[in-house]
């Protein structure tokens, strides 16, 4: 005899196109990206931020320059510099801020992510 089992429903992916600013790209981060793009000598570059499995907390952030924008990428422009995020990564980054900080301990890009339940000590991986 077979039994029907109902599966839990999955919430639909957020419609980032209807949100005014689903991700914040700070002026400080944009300025640093502009500087790095100028060093590369390719004005067509944008900074891509993505999430991948790994790190001590389960997920980790990745950054890379990209000339190609996919049709479904979110593009956030700050001071003429573009940040790209793919839809899968955006689910984990909704409401986050991409910033750049300089301190006595060094300079780095920082993601302040309200969706991260825990982060590792170095700040490069998180869990949800």
Curated annotation (Swiss-Prot):
GO annotation, biological process: iron-sulfur cluster assembly
KW Iron (keyword) present: yes
Taxonomic placement: Bacteria, Pseudomonadati, Pseudomonadota, Gammaproteobacteria, Lysobacterales
Record-given protein name: Iron-sulfur cluster insertion protein ErpA
GO CC list: cytosol
HAMAP family: Fe_S_insert_ErpA
GO molecular function, one term: 4 iron, 4 sulfur cluster binding
Keyword Iron-sulfur: yes
PROSITE patterns (alphabetical): HESB (PS01152)
SUPFAM superfamilies referenced in this protein's UniProt entry, alphabetically: HesB-like domain (SSF89360)
Cofactor: iron-sulfur cluster
Complex and partners: Homodimer.
InterPro entries cross-referenced by the UniProt entry: FeS_biogenesis, FeS_cluster_insertion, FeS_cluster_insertion_CS, FeS_cluster_insertion_RrpA, HesB-like_dom_sf
Gene3D superfamilies: HesB-like domain (2.60.300.12)
């Amino acid at each position: 005899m077979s039994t029907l089992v109902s599966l839990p429903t999955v919430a639909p992916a957020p419609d980032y196109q209807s949100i005014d600013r689903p991700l914040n790209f700070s002026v400080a981060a944009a300025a640093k990206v502009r500087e790095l793009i100028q060093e590369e000598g390719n004005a067509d570059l944008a900074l891509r931020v993505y999430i991948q499995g790994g790190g001590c907390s389960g997920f980790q952030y990745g950054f890379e320059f990209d000339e190609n924008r996919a049709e479904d990428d979110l593009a956030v422009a700050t001071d003429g510099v573009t940040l790209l995020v793919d839809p899968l990564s955006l689910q984990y980054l909704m409401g986050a801020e991409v910033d750049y900080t300089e301190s006595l301990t060094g300079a780095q890009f920082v993601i302040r992510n309200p969706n991260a339940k825990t982060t590792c000590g170095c700040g490069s991986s998180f869990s949800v």
